[in-house]
Amino acid sequence: MNQTLGPILDPQVNAVIARLEETRRRPVGGGPRTDAAGNNAASNQDPYAWADYGFSIHPDQGNLIYLLCRAQRAARVAEFATSVGMSTLYAAAAVRDNGGGVVIGSELVPAKAFTAWRNLTEAGLAHLVDIRQGDARETMRDLGGPVDFMLVDGWPGAQGPSLARQVMEIVAPQIRVGGMVMNDNGEEDYLEFVRDPANGFRSMTLPIKGGTELSVKVN
C-alpha cells in the first residue's frame, strides 16, 4: 500500500525531497529563515551570501507544480531560479511521468547549480534537466520551443524593476497559449504584468504560502 502523502509515487524522488525539506534552516515553530549568525535571509539582497542555504518552495507548491504539469502533459518546463533544485524535482518528476521532455532551470550561483545537479542525480531525474548557470535575463532568452509551465521564484534583486518582472517579460512570448506560470514572491510589478489583460494572461492568487500567484496564458 502506498504511504506517500503527495502525488509523486517514486520513493527515490520523495526521499530527496524529504531530505531537502528537513535541512531547510528555519527556527522551531516557524519564522524567517536565518543563517548561522542569526541573520534574516530576507534582509540580504546578495544571492551569493546565501549560497549554502537552499531557498525552497513549500511542499504544497511543489505538489501543485507536479499536478499542473501532469494535467497539461507538460514536456517543456522552465524555472527561475533553480536554487538547490527543490522545485526542479517536482517538475522533472512530472515531465518524466508524462513520457519525457525537459526542465530548463536558471541559477546565478554556481554552488547552488552544482548542488541542484547533485540532488537531481540522486533522484534519478538529471537526464531530464538543463540547468543554465548565469543571469536568467540571458540564459532564458531562448528556451528551445513553446513552454508549457513556468515557475518564477527568483532572488528579489536590487532597486528598480524586479528580476521576476524582467524575466517574465523575456519568457512570456515563449509560453504557449494554455501554458501556466506560478510565482512565489508576489513582486508588485510582476503582479501588475500578469494581471494586465493586455499581456495575454488571466491570473489569481492562491492561498498557499502566504499567496501564490497562478496565471494562464489565454492569447
State the predicted function of each range.
Residues 1-149, 157-182, 186-219:
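A short alpha-helical cap/connector motif
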Residues 153:
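Active-site residues of response regulator receiver
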